[in-house]
């Protein structure tokens, strides 16, 4: 394996770690860092909730991971440390109370853009010391319709606001996504359009002969019945008899408030089915290249079978490392943008 010089700090102090693993699932899931320290670091909870930074190379100006220690485990030889990033405060597996806020008729987020509403929600959840926001949706959408009321989990609010913004100016609609970045001082939730596989720049190319150690290909189940809900209660349903015969009834339901008639909803549903039909493969790649790839980057995979080759989006990443070696795992797919996990839907 190639030599690297990874670095881990806890509250600014460099750690003499033994080995570790960084894992980011993507799709607004919380990234984690698990690493092992010599037994001399053991102590009764003395590491809990301290800030951890992981640099893939010690020369990097910004960390690959910024998070907080959730738990430690001591055995006879070492201490295992588990940390999660800022999104862990908003997800169920965060090891802490889930961030939420209460909105009423008198105190709410009405009239704010999606970005401004998310920023205010983060402030109300008292997470501004751990999480900021950068960018806005394209097109810009408001938090007015429908109005948000009651007790709402922060992550569900973010997903709901993002699902309202779909850029429908091309053959395949493109939604907005959010992912964590680091500016060297703080984690930021970056809002951006999901990458265009056909026209976006290819960041890296993988081939079976040169830089792929192992590859797993998954043939996804296609949605055979697509239901699209539009504005003011209009809706359209598209079903495909051949797909139903092959995959049974696999439902997909999405909402697009820019559609104002049943005909527009039906046309949108047909686009979703056709997009799924053409790109139903997902990959898991083991490699030694691509440590700095991030979610939404476009890469190209070249295989002997052309139906498995083409451009893919990076979804998640795993890096196993020690002071002198590393390996990388990438999760990539061509799942049509409007089927992303940011829209509350079922697509597998």
Annotated model-derived regions:
Residues 1-114:
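Beta-strand-rich assembly/attachment modules of structural machines
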Residues 1-2, 107, 159, 163, ...:
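Acidic, small/polar-enriched beta strand-loop surface segments
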Residues 4-16, 57-63, 157-173, 205-209, ...:
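Short, solvent-exposed secondary-structure boundary motifs
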Residues 10, 18, 24-27, 41, ...:
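Intrinsically disordered, low-complexity segments enriched in small/polar residues
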Residues 15-17, 24-30, 76, 90, ...:
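A broad, structure-centric signal for solvent-exposed, well-ordered loop/edge residues
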Residues 23-41, 77-89, 228, 257, ...:
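Oligomerization/assembly interface segments of phage tail-like spikes and tubes
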Residues 56-84, 172, 299-331:
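Short beta-strand and beta-hairpin "edge-sheet" elements
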Residues 75-78, 82-217:
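Charged- and aromatic-enriched interaction segments used to assemble
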């Amino acid at each position: 394996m190639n030599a690297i010089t990874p670095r881990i700090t806890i509250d600014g102090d460099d750690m003499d770690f033994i080995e570790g693993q960084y894992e980011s699932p993507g799709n607004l899931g919380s990234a984690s860092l698990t690493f092992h320290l010599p037994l001399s670091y053991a102590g009764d909870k003395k590491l809990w909730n301290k800030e951890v930074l992981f640099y893939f190379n010690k020369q990097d100006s910004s960390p690959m991971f910024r998070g907080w220690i959730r738990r430690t485990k001591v055995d006879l030889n070492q201490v295992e440390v588990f940390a999660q990033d800022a999104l862990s405060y908003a997800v169920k597996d965060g090891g802490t109370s889930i961030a939420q806020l209460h909105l009423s008729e008198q105190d709410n987020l009405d009239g704010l853009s999606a970005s401004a509403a998310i920023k205010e929600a983060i402030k109300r959840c008292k997470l501004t010391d751990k999480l900021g926001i950068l960018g806005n949706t394209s097109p810009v959408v408001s938090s007015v319709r429908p109005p948000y009321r009651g007790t709402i989990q922060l992550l569900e609010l973010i997903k709901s606001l993002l699902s309202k913004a779909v850029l429908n100016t091309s053959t395949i609609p493109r939604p907005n996504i959010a992912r964590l970045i680091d500016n060297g001082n703080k984690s930021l939730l970056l809002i951006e359009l999901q990458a265009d596989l056909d026209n976006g720049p290819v960041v890296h190319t993988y081939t079976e002969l040169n830089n792929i150690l192992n590859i797993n290909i998954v043939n996804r189940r296609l949605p055979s019945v697509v239901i699209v809900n539009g504005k003011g209660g209009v809706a359209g349903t598209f079903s495909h008899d051949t797909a139903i015969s092959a995959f049974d009834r696999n439902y997909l339901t999405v909402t697009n408030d820019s559609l104002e008639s049943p005909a527009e909803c039906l046309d949108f549903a047909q686009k979703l089915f056709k997009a799924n039909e053409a790109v139903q493969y997902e990959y898991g790649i083991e490699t030694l290249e691509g440590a700095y790839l991030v979610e939404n980057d476009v890469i190209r995979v070249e295989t002997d079978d052309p139906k498995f080759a083409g451009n893919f989006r990076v979804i998640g990443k795993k890096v196993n490392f020690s002071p002198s070696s590393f390996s990388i795992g990438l999760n990539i797919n061509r799942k049509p943008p409007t089927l992303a996990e940011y829209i509350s839907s079922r697509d597998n």
